[in-house]
Amino acid sequence: YPPKPESPGSDASPEDWAKYHAAVRHYVNLITRQRY
């Protein structure tokens, strides 16, 4: 499996959080695609 995206710190900017959430969504899509 690809590595899970690391959560930005609590002091991260909104842009960092947006990138993190996009990476998590992509990560979940990769895993569910492999599973089914």
UniProtKB/Swiss-Prot annotation:
UniProt keyword Secreted present: yes
Residues that bear Tyrosine amide: Y36
Coiled coil: none
One example of a Gene Ontology biological process annotation: neuropeptide signaling pathway
Keyword Lipid biosynthesis: no
Domain of life: Eukaryota
Keywords: Amidation, Hormone, Secreted
Disulphide-bridged cysteine pairs: none
Family, similarity comment: Belongs to the NPY family.
Protein name per its UniProtKB record: Peptide YY-like
Organism: Oreochromis niloticus
